[in-house]
Regions:
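Short hydrophobic, aromatic-rich alpha-helical segments embedded in or entering the lipid bilayer
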Residues: 176-190
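Membrane-water interface segments at the C-terminal ends of transmembrane alpha-helices
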Residues: 2, 6-117, 141-166, 170, ...
Length: 195
């Protein structure tokens, strides 16, 4: 029992809390962006895809460094957030959530968009013929049909957010009890030979 008492659970709790909130944000943002992409022309859709999928091709540490540049207290956005909302992103738990969300978001977006593209347009036309609004068609026709793809995107997003290391370590750091997630803590233990 002494072994169990010596285990610090804060990295696990911080990781779970971060991953859950990042997944919720990516879920709604990914579905909204995927729905918007459905309505765009091919060139505009390609540009949007390139921008939203950028975190997939960037190394996570580079994504974290870019977030650090944007949200630093020496940059306009960081200054604005601090002066108006007392929100500090760098070296804080909101930084963990932001890093995990940015890195995991493309997985939700890609899965939602692929699921929406698989929906038969005849269902949408039938809903319009019945006089349903676009929102009602989306909510009662498109979402249920695309449900399995959205569910798989949600699972992938959660898993990616839970295991995020690179961007989190760059933006939020490694503060025990505050920003040390499981991935960041495991890296520290392997470097300090605490295993």
């Amino acid at each position: 029992m002494d072994f169990l008492a010596s285990i610090n659970m804060s990295p696990l709790l911080i990781s779970l809390k971060t991953a859950i909130i990042a997944t919720v944000v990516a879920f709604f943002g990914g579905i909204a962006c995927a729905r918007w992409a459905m309505k765009l022309k091919p060139l505009s859709k390609s540009i949007l895809d390139g921008i939203l999928n950028l975190p997939l091709v960037l190394p996570p540490t580079v994504a974290g460094f870019l977030l650090l540049l944007i949200f630093s207290l020496k940059r306009p956005l960081g200054i604005y957030l601090w002066e108006h909302y007392q929100l500090k992103v760098v070296l804080s738990w909101p930084g963990c959530v932001l890093a995990a969300t940015v890195v995991a978001f493309p997985l939700m977006y890609r899965n939602a968009r692929a699921a929406f593209e698989q929906v038969d347009v005849n269902y949408i036309y039938a809903g319009r013929t019945l006089g349903l609004s676009e929102w009602t068609i989306f909510r009662k026709v498109v979402i249920p049909v695309a449900g399995p793809g959205i569910a798989s995107g949600t699972i992938l997003t959660f898993a990616r957010a839970l295991g995020e290391y690179g961007a989190t370590s760059m933006l939020a750091g490694n503060i025990l009890g505050k920003t040390r997630t499981m991935a960041v803590g495991d890296r520290r233990r392997s470097q300090c030979t605490e295993l």
